């Protein structure tokens, strides 16, 4: 084989591998393309699962078995993406989506902290959505939580309200989300195997976050609100709390590498090894300052920044030292609100000219 042909073949193989990694979690596209409920399909129409793009063979089989789950998986993915964008709105990488089935584009081909967070928050979103759908009677294979009564619950409090079924949500999310990674058979010791192990670890960390933060909720019963009796159940934490928890894990994520036993090990052995609740990554993050088609970085040109902040949202860091443009904009807000009898609030509209700063 000539050197030119060898180079072309290598380039082609590298391109294919990158495309497979970019689309590695393309089930995320369920968040961007609304999933129709199974009952909306008429006789003779194509089955739901054949119309969904981005599913791996294993995920497609699960879709066929649990068609009523798919709309909630899409909702969970959407919840995860929105939370990702909230947590990173003041960072150079702000969890932007692109208009294709990869959802996040080439930025996910790097085994970075950002990829770790994205896998974790998406997996958490599925647990959250499926657990709640069980409680609301939306799914045929689950119902209210069957979690045993907590030992520290006062004896005179009743345990029996319809709780979020976190156990089922965790199990189903593990089966569905991890299916793509587990059905692959990468060569031992390869970069692809290391990345797959990284993805599985971060998927699990996201699921555990939802499970760990779920807590007991109670409702009072009694004459005139005397609360002489309480009924309690298991309830999911607000997903914002889950996002904040996983963001903390992002900040303390462990740098890993593949060892000779084909397991991930921590690069710095002086630190405690990560637990199943921790995020892990393989590659250093790009600086995300400039647009880069290869890494998927969209850059920070045109992003708003805070002139007075010294944090990541400050103009110096957000704009990567390139400077910023200042312009004035008119903001309209409700003001001078008064309660009117009965029963509404009447407000005036106030305009204010404010300075805004945008990265060059």
From Swiss-Prot:
**Organism the protein comes from:** Xenopus laevis
Q: Where is the signal peptide?
A: 1-16
Q: Which Pfam families match?
A: wnt
Q: Lipid (O-palmitoleoyl serine) attached at which positions?
A: 224
* Glycosylated residues, chain numbering: 94, 100, 292, 306
Q: Which molecular-function annotations from GO does this UniProt entry contain?
A: cytokine activity; frizzled binding
Biological process annotations from GO: canonical Wnt signaling pathway; cell fate commitment; muscle cell differentiation; neuron differentiation; positive regulation of convergent extension involved in gastrulation; positive regulation of non-canonical Wnt signaling pathway
Which pairs of positions does the record mark as disulfide bonds? 84-95, 134-142, 144-162, 218-232, 220-227, 289-320, 305-315, 319-359, 335-350, 337-347, 342-343
Q: Name one GO cellular component term.
A: extracellular space
Q: What is this protein called?
A: Protein Wnt-5b
Post-translational modification note: Palmitoleoylation is required for efficient binding to frizzled receptors. Depalmitoleoylation leads to Wnt signaling pathway inhibition.
Q: Where is the protein localized?
A: Secreted, Extracellular space, Extracellular matrix
Q: Which InterPro entries match?
A: Wnt, Wnt_C, Wnt_CS
Task: Note the superkingdom of the native organism.
Answer: Eukaryota
Q: Which family does it belong to?
A: Belongs to the Wnt family.
